[in-house]
Structures are given as C-alpha cells and as structure tokens.
Amino acid sequence: MYVNARSIVNKHKELELYVREENIDIIGISETWLNEAILDSEMHIEGYTFLRKDRQDKDKKRGGGVAIYVKNDLNAIQREELYEVNFPESIFCSISCRGDSTLLGVIYRPPDSSKINDEALFSLINRISQENVILMGDFNYPELKWDKAETISESHPFVECVNNNFLIQLVDEPTRDKNYLDLVLCSDESIVESLFVGEPFETSDHQLIRFKLISNRDETNKIITNLNYFKANYSEMREYIKTRNWDTLIDGSEVEDLWKKLTEELYMLRDKFIPKSKKVKNKAKWVTKRVTRFRRAKTKAWNKYISSGKDQKFFDRYKIKLRKSVRENRKAKENYEQRLASNIKTDCKSFYSYVNSKRRAKDRVGPLKDSAGKVLNNDRETAEVLNDYFSSVFTVEDLSYIPNAKQMFQGDLESEGLNTLVIDENTVGQKLAELNVNKSQGPDGIHPKLLSELQLELKKPLTKLFNLSISRGIVPQDWKEAIVTPLFKKGSKASPENYRPVSLTSVVGKILESIVKDQIVAHLEFFNLIKSSQHGFTKGRSCLTNLLDFMETVTRELDVSKPIDLIYLDFAKAFDKVPYRRLFKKLETHGISGSVLKWIVNWLGNRRQKTSINKECSNWKNVTSGVPQGSVLGPVLFIIYINDLDSELISKVAKFADDTKMCKSISSAKDAEILRNDLIRLDQWSKDWQMQFNLEKCVVIHMGQKNNQYEYMLGNKRLRQSKMEKDLGIIVDSSCKFSEQCNEAIKHANSTLGMIKRSITCKSKNIIVKLYKALVRPKLEFCVQAWRPFLKKDIVNLEKVQHRATKMIQACRGLNYEDRLIRCGLSTLEDRRTRGDMIEVFKMIKGIDKINFKNFFSPAANNRTRGHKYKLAKSRSRLDIRKNFFSQRVVSGWNELPASVIEADSVNSFKNRYDRFINNKTVRM
C-alpha cells in the first residue's frame, strides 16, 4: 500500500487500524511531516519494521518526509548507500522472501522541485533500475496523464528517464482530483497485480494505492503457541507433587545428576500442567466492533461515490461518514486509556506497558555489515557475526607474569575470611518468593513463575542442590550457558562494535548467584574492604553520591582560586575483559578462599554463549574472560577486580563500576606533574591487570580562570581537551554552572511530553499527572542535588516544562499555573529541589548514604538556641558556583527545620514530616 499522508502523526491510530484489519504487509508513505522531535516509537506498529527519512531542509516549512513500514518476516534492510545520490526525500530498503530480493523505494518530489533536485532524481532512478525495484511516491507532475501518454516540456525529462531505464508506470487513475500525482514504477510488471486506486486516506486529499506483490513468501497462517504460565492451575500441580516422592526422586551425590533429576521433574510438571495459548490476534487493543462498523460504513460510502460517477452528493455523504469514523476511532482509544488508568492500582503493568510501547520501539539489529563490508540479510548470519565480535574482545591472559595484588583483607583468612557457605531453606524460600515472575526464562527453559509458585515445594531440593554445589565447587553446565541479546548503544547500526552483549542465564543459577553475592557483599562491608571511591553496586552509594563527592572537591578548590583539572577515563569493554587468574588472585586478597573461591572458579570456567536475534541463534562460542553482563554475581566481582585501581594515586578519584574520573588542583607545574605521575601509575595498572583504556574517549577538562591548561599523556596518547563531558548522565562543563545540563534535561523532558501529547488520546488529569510523574519529572530531577541550577533563566526554563505538562490537561487549561498545581496536587520544581536537598542531608546525617559527612559539613559551633541538635555551620563562599553548591546552599534550610522533622526514624517518615511542616508553614503565611 502507498499513501500520501499529509502528516502521519495525526493519522497514526487510523493507519494502525487500517493495516491490521486489511493485513497489509508493506506501507509506503510520503509527506510524513515528521521531524527529529517525534520518536520512532510513536510511529511504531507492532510486528512491523519502521524506516523513515525526514525532510532535512530546515528553511522549508513543515512537510515532506518519507517512510516505509515492512512486516518483520520480510527482513527489511535499509539501503543507505542509495542516499549518496543526494535526492533528499527518498528512502529505500531491500526485502527478501525465500532468496528473492526486491528493492522498495518511496520518494517525495515537491511541487517547486529545482532542476538540480530533478537531476538527482533522474540519477537515482538510473541507479536503482539495475535491480528488481518497486518505486512509489508523489512525483508532483500534475499535467502528466499516463493513461493517455501525454507529456509536456516540464514532465518530458522525467518520462524519458523512466522509459530509458525500462521502468513501467502502473497507476492509470488520478490520485488527487484529476491529477496523476502519485505513481508506482516497477522494473517487472509481472511481480505486481491487482493494483487499484482507493479512497483518500482519512483527511488526506490524496487517494491511497493498493497492489499485491507476487513473491515466494509462505502465506499460510502460522499459528504461534506459547506456554502460558499465568493461566496454569498451580493448586492442581501442588496436589500432584504430593503423589511424587521428591525426597527419593530428587536425590544424588553428584551436582549434575541432582540437577538433571530436578529439571526432569520440572519439565514433566511444565508439560503436564502449563497450558498453551495462541498468539493474540493482529488487532489493536482499543478497537471495538463499533469502530470497525463505522470504518466499513465509511468505505462503503466511498465506493458508492465512485460508482455514481463521482456525484458530489455521494461525496458529501462520504465526508460525513469519514468524520464519524475518525471521531469513533479516537473515542474508543480514549475510553481504552481511561480504563487502563482507572485500573492502575490493581493492574499497573497493563497501563505502563501500553505507555512504554509509545515511548520506544524495540530496536531491530542492523542491517549489519561483515568484515568484508557485505550487508547481511538474515538473522542467522547477523547473530553469527555479532557472536564472533563479542567473542573477539575476550582477553588472552598473560600467564607468564601475574603481578602481586594489594592485600586488602587484614584479618585471619581461616577464621575470618569467607571460605565456606552453608545455605538454609529459609534463605532459598525467600529468594524464590522475591523472583520477578515477569522476567524471561533462561536457556534451560525453567520459568520464574513456575519457581515462584512452587517455592514451598522447591526450597528443600534446591537447598540440597545449592549446598552440594558450593561444597563440591561444581556448577551445573546449564548455569554456565548464556543466550546473548545484543543491545544497540549509539553510532552506526551496521557496526557490530556498537552493540553491547547482555546474557540471559538460568533463573535457578541466578538464585544461587544471589545468595553467594549477598555473602560476599556482607563480608566486604563488615571488613570495609571496598574503597570509598567506588560508588557502583555498593549499598548506600549511587550516581548521586558519586557526583556530590566529586563536585564538592571541584567547587571547593575553585572557590579558593585554585584551577583544577578533571580527567575522565574510559575502559574498553571492561566487563568482558577481566582475566580470570588475575581475578582469582584479587579475590584471595579480599579474604575470599576455600570452597567459595573454588565455586567461583568453576562458575567462570567452561562458560559458553550464543547470540540470538528473532529466535535465530548463532553457534556456541567459548567465553574465556570477563564477568557475564546480565549476571547477578558479575558486578560484585568486577568492583573487587578494580578496587585497588586508585590505591597508589594522590589525586581525587571517583568510580562508578568502570566509570572512573580523577581531579587535582593545579597551582603550579609541580601539581601538574603529580597528576601526570598518577596517569603513569594508571597506565601501568592497566597493563599489569590487562584492562585497556579506550584512549580516544579519555579526556581532560580544565577549570578555573588562571588554568595553564597543561597537557597530559595516558600511555603514548595525549589526552584530548574538552569543554564539557557527560558524567553518569550529567553534563559537567568547564564553567561548572550546569546550564548545558539544564538544557539537556529540558530537551529530553519536552521530547517525552511531546510523545505523550501525540500518542495519548485521553488528556484527563488522572492520566497526564501519572505519566508526568513517571516519565517526565524524573528527567528533570535525576541527581539534581549535584547540579541544581542557580541562574534565573535555567530555573525558569525548567519550571516551564511543568507549565506545559499541566496545560495539557483538558480540565486545567483555563487556570493559571498556581491553580493548576493545586488541582493536580503538584509542587513547583524549585520547591521539590529544596525538599530533595533536605532529604539528602537527612540520609547523610543518618548514614543511609555512605558518604564522608565531615567532608561536606561541620556542626554549628553554638547549638544552644532553639531547634534541633544537628545544626550545621555556615561557611563563607566567594564564587556563585560554590555558594549554590549542595553543601553550602542547604545549611540555612536545614537549620530552620524543627526537631520533630529531623528526628524521624526513616526516610519516608522524614518526607511525611517535612511535607506537613511546609504545608503548615504555607497556611500560616
């Protein structure tokens, strides 16, 4: 199907309804009127690949743009090399069916097309005519009448180009009034049949074009069935288990044997009691019978208009039916959204699943290119290339030299170290109860829902299995196998290096990983073994504590007129490159030995993985280094491995897992030399422990007015100077004012608001406020205590986002901002930032956030006045960036709080007391 949409955004619901009911495989669209603010996910139709190319000429008014929807089983591969011809509004993809390949294209030639633009179009046609091609589009030659083969001077070059390239034009009816604007060209007319010009697409003034593409595609209905774990009769299953003597059936002295017997029982229960359900019908969830009836009435009215010889009277009737159909369609969608919102307390998953489908479409992988530059056109080949790449980054460990690791554990290894582990049934039962039943099953096919429902029955045999596994230091092979899902990061989708592997492993194996991890973490915390510079995967530390701790040092040094240099470091494929023998040595230096260490050694040994794309899998590859991304235990092992990274450094260092940064005040060349020496030590550490830096991404930011901007080397590479850098998602710039971060947060928040406005039909307070709180406001408040704006323009611009959000609510549009906030139960963003400041101080004082409190605050010298006992001393600051940083700005507000608020025994209690205090204070005013 091809259509000139004249804006797809306001017709997307109707398009989805039409293609599902008519079972359309390919949809070519011109005049999409899309722009960069509109996300792919907003245009997503489940089961289809969506490709787009928006108008690039910013000087032109809105309009233009082309797109193609292709059903996923047709394996659409975008042909980006054809854009080199430089005809701007064109998009191409290849589709394949059983070995046959067809090139599909959509173009839009504007009415005022220049001679240069037309020449580019002719060059494009000349290039694509070498292939089996179908080209759809609005060519905007109104005087051209293909059914009469009449041409005039303006369209003559185009007709000559089509004829010279032996393309065939198939449309023999006008598509807009009496004009032949929309055409379908093909290289072989035998592959196209049943072409007809239909009714206008909704409110567009162009008629749609339908045709059938002949291919070797298997068009038999494939009924896909899945096991439905949420419809099983678990009571009946439990009764059946009572008839089985699991104490006898699930018994053995070997780990693999015991695991095999347990899985056989679980597979038997699965096959016997878990029902199969067919795939949901190809129908939008909000479509009702009434919607379908109105749409058919509209189509019937159009057919009457055509059969009447285009009598105006019948056209007027068609327009009435069209308006009713559009109105009913939108009403049905609004009612569906209201039902989801009203049931949110009992079924929040359905509501947010629906919303998330509008936020992001599932990223398709590729099309990838192999090492020879060949475009891969099937999922199996793509999976193989990705798996080869993921395996290529593994470290070949240098066993000829293993350096001595710093001894972090100072206790008695035998009596105080973590060398053995005994697991009880209560621990296993609790882990089973905590399983997220909505997660996927692992490669072994055992679903978390099944495990959760049978927690009472399974905790005894699993406890036996886990203890045997730990004591023997043996892990079942099933737990060491991973199905890897490639996640796109950024850059070109054609390059395998722009994908990150995430491993899907056995759920049962993850339960034991979790128990082992808990014991390791408890051991590390008890002996205070993890350095305070590490904020990732550690209790009481986070992105926020990392940023606060680091920027406290930066702003303090700048305030006393000391220039400071910040260096951001980037490890290359850090999690995948951890060499095992060196890791085991690090574990020993942290007091982990005996059967626990033996178990970890076995858990990491003989691992293998395969990559899966659309259920097509690569061959298995051995995993020879790294901690599995997606595992439970992996992150803890990683932070142990890099724990001593900064042990010998003088500069200030902050880490979040592998994200590492350092800073040093630079008052002289001697200070710069200290920082250089730290970089030399880091370079040596990376060589000793075989953790490579990605030198292209390691940068230095110079701060301070009198900064001499010294140069620094890491290895043999001079560090690139940067004015700003993204630090854990927050933009840090050389001015330290965070205006760029404000702009970035506003941009992302407005983008999400735009998605909500375009995608959510119902604009009730209930829905908009929920979506604003869940999806928009967090973008404005992520780690905001570390970058809270103090420039008036930034404060105003941030608040404007909430202005826009509350204006979207239909019932609030006539109210001023203050009244809208009251109606919606919202505070200003500025007030929320103050509240967040107070919460963070409370968490620091109470030790909930494990950050050096004395580095931020000093107790007030005279604390005998009214108020609480936790008052803070106020210090003087010279620069605005220091006056307005967290440790300085919070003091007055904190000291004014009454003891009744400060003495709360939990964070939630503090929040409630603070809110009551502020509300009462506002009322008194």
Predicted regions and their residues:
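Short phosphate/oxyanion-binding micro-motifs
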Residues: M1-Q130, E143-F166, D177, I241, ...
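Arg/Lys-enriched, amphipathic patches
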Residues: T102-G105, N132-M136, N140-E150, K212-N377, ...
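Short, conserved micro-motifs composed of acidic
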Residues: D172-I191, L195-V197, K615, N677, ...
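Non-catalytic, peripheral interaction segments enriched in hydrophobic/basic residues
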Residues: K278, V287, E337-A341, I520, ...
